[in-house]
Amino acid sequence: MTVEERSNTAKVDILGVDFDNTTMLQMVENIKTFFANQSTNNLFIVTANPEIVNYATTHQAYLELINQASYIVADGTGVVKASHRLKQPLAHRIPGIELMDECLKIAHVNHQKVFLLGATNEVGEAAQYALQQRYPNISFAHHHGYIDLEDETVVKRIELFKPDYIFVGMGFPKQEEWIMTHENQFESKVMMGVGGSLEVFAGAKKRAPYIFRKLNIEWIYRALIDWKRIGRLKSIPIFMYKIAKAKRKIKKAK
């Protein structure tokens, strides 16, 4: 099958990435409706932060790939603030890990199946165990994320398992590339790249305390506890510069 066509929700163009102007509540309803309609297509969700948008601006193939997703939501306050600067305000930030958790709540109620693809075997198994304790009605399976895009072994395992959700935690761009490489081999799945969410659910990484999330500075906490991320912080001023440049271009066009 193929992915569901782009939703008919209002779009907000942030440096070429077509974000859906939606809320967490609306996304939950969209996912419920997808299963209720028994579509044979797949629902492909991208949760894009400033780093992903930056990458997309310099990698045309990736930009075109993610713009084929059923939904693109703003995972990061930087994207929401950018939308306001460009006078196209997005309604809400929708963190990928929280959207994944909302999917798991739906799966728990409906006794569905979830396939976790990503991280190491140890981390993946720990995430699966933790989630199984939280959501006992879900059937889980896991495979590590250290695979080539063309590897058919894991695809065959997924086909045999017949999950309702496939969460791919390989980091961008690989997770989205994997989804679009193989989505036509599946049907009726919710497919979403979830970055490092498996590490968080496994307890290998901590999510920022509530106060950091409330103040929309979760990225600062992540950098403080994981020095490997410091180098990635340079994407923020680059993103801000690109937004300022886009804003000036819009003003000149008026």
From Swiss-Prot:
Pathway it works in: Cell wall biogenesis; poly(ribitol phosphate) teichoic acid biosynthesis
Molecular functions per Gene Ontology: N-acetylglucosaminyldiphosphoundecaprenol N-acetyl-beta-D-mannosaminyltransferase activity
Superkingdom to which the source organism belongs: Bacteria
Keywords: Cell wall biogenesis/degradation, Glycosyltransferase, Teichoic acid biosynthesis, Transferase
Biological process annotations from GO: cell wall organization; teichoic acid biosynthetic process
Catalysed reaction, written as an equation: UDP-N-acetyl-alpha-D-mannosamine + N-acetyl-alpha-D-glucosaminyl-di-trans,octa-cis-undecaprenyl diphosphate = N-acetyl-beta-D-mannosaminyl-(1->4)-N-acetyl-alpha-D-glucosaminyl di-trans,octa-cis-undecaprenyl diphosphate + UDP + H(+)
InterPro entries: TAB_Glycosyltransferase, TagA_TarA, WecG_TagA_CpsF
EC number: 2.4.1.187
Family: Belongs to the glycosyltransferase 26 family. TagA/TarA subfamily.
Described purpose of this protein according to its UniProt entry: Catalyzes the conversion of GlcNAc-PP-undecaprenol into ManNAc-GlcNAc-PP-undecaprenol, the first committed lipid intermediate in the de novo synthesis of teichoic acid.
Name by which UniProt lists this protein: N-acetylglucosaminyldiphosphoundecaprenol N-acetyl-beta-D-mannosaminyltransferase
